[in-house]
């Protein structure tokens, strides 16, 4: 009898253990987190992470760094952030083969109006940067709807990252928002940004360093346009193999721009601006300037950064009457081998201050 009872107990325990195994594996496969703390502590226990209506506490980062290879992250509901003056970031994601997505109807709202004071990163309140995609390699970010970043939107330092159909809407910051760059790219390779929609008050795209970068099918409204630079003065001062194409820039200070730092060294090469349409530009339609110092132009170009093998092809549109159509200020001998085709920017003034314009281009 004792032997029979022992056998029954053993069989019952064994069956319970077997039944528990699928439940445990399912938990590892998919997790839903409703707090930033739980997401941080449990992020490596699941292959699919759903972030549901998370309220990130003031002064904290929604920390999704060091994810397991192949993790999928889904933003669901509304993601919000507590108020504190600090540098951020509000969100940080890293890992390999990561997919960052959002559920239908989701939004990520920085509520930047709490920080906006017209000074951006140049003074006033200390404002947190929004989304660090650093070491987010062989990965993708798709379909995010982002609103009201306090300052910079995406800081990108990654390899093989695809960003598709992302919206950054800072239109509420027209009066007081400042330095709300959408995509800042540095020390990165093989970055592809496709189908971005941006309403902001600074660069729609700014590439400070990196190679094999594409930006296509973009819509940029209200900011400073599509920029290479500023290049120079950093540890990495090379921009090469960049294509910016099939995009619209409207109601912005600049259309397309290359800016390099005064008295610095570096390289800008094999950069193509193709099929770019401009309208409502208030400062410069097309600008290349090699005189940037402390964030402002000096009017005196230097030639330590070579700007070569540059293509402006079918960059067309209009600027406001008090704006300048085209402005090229190159250092002596530093702007070479440009291809200039189908460029037609009208409505503004013709600059009398262009210098060292390369053969084939016009100013």
UniProtKB/Swiss-Prot annotation:
Swiss-Prot/TrEMBL catalytic activity: (1,4-alpha-D-galacturonosyl)n+m + H2O = (1,4-alpha-D-galacturonosyl)n + (1,4-alpha-D-galacturonosyl)m
Annotated signal peptide: 1-20
Residues that span the membrane, as ranges: none
Enzyme class: hydrolase
Keyword field: Cell wall biogenesis/degradation, Disulfide bond, Glycoprotein, Glycosidase, Hydrolase, Repeat, Secreted, Signal, Zymogen
Subcellular location: Secreted
A GO molecular-function descriptor: polygalacturonase activity
Keyword Cell wall biogenesis/degradation among UniProt keywords: yes
Pfam family, one: Glyco_hydro_28
Job of this protein: Involved in maceration and soft-rotting of plant tissue. Hydrolyzes the 1,4-alpha glycosidic bonds of de-esterified pectate in the smooth region of the plant cell wall.
Protein name: Probable endopolygalacturonase B
Organism: Aspergillus flavus (strain ATCC 200026 / FGSC A1120 / IAM 13836 / NRRL 3357 / JCM 12722 / SRRC 167)
């Amino acid at each position: 009898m004792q032997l029979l009872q022992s056998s029954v107990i053993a069989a019952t325990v064994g069956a319970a253990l077997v039944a528990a195994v699928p439940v445990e594996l399912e938990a590892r496969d998919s997790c839903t987190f409703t707090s930033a703390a739980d997401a941080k502590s449990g992020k490596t226990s699941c292959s699919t992470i759903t972030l549901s209506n998370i309220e990130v506490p003031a002064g904290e980062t929604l920390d999704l760094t060091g994810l397991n290879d192949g993790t999928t992250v889904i933003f669901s509901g509304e993601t919000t952030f507590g108020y504190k003056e600090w540098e951020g970031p509000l969100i940080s994601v890293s890992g390999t083969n990561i997919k960052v997505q959002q559920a239908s109807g989701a939004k990520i709202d920085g509520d930047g109006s709490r920080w906006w004071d017209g000074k951006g990163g140049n003074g006033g309140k200390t404002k947190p940067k929004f989304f660090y995609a650093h070491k987010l390699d062989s990965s993708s970010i798709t379909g995010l709807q982002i609103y009201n970043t306090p300052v910079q939107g995406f800081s990108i330092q990654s390899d093989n990252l695809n960003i598709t159909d992302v919206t950054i809407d800072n239109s509420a910051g027209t009066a007081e928002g400042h330095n709300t760059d959408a995509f800042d790219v540095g020390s990165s390779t093989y970055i592809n940004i496709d189908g971005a929609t941006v309403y902001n008050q600074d660069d729609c795209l700014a590439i400070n360093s990196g190679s094999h970068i594409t930006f296509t099918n973009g819509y940029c409204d209200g900011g400073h346009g599509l920029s290479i630079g500023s290049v120079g003065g950093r540890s990495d001062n090379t921009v090469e193999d960049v294509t910016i194409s099939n995009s619209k820039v409207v109601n912005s200070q600049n259309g397309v721009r290359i800016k390099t730092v005064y008295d610095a060294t570096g390289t800008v090469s094999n950069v193509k601006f193709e099929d770019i349409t401009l309208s409502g530009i208030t400062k410069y339609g097309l600008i290349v300037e090699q005189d940037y110092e402390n964030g402002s132009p000096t009017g005196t170009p230097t030639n330590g950064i070579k700007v070569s093998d540059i293509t402006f092809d079918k960059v067309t549109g209009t600027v406001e009457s008090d704006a300048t159509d085209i402005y090229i200020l190159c250092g002596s001998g530093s702007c070479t081998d440009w291809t200039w085709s189908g460029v037609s920017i009208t409505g503004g003034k013709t600059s009398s201050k262009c210098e060292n314009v390369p053969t084939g281009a016009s100013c």
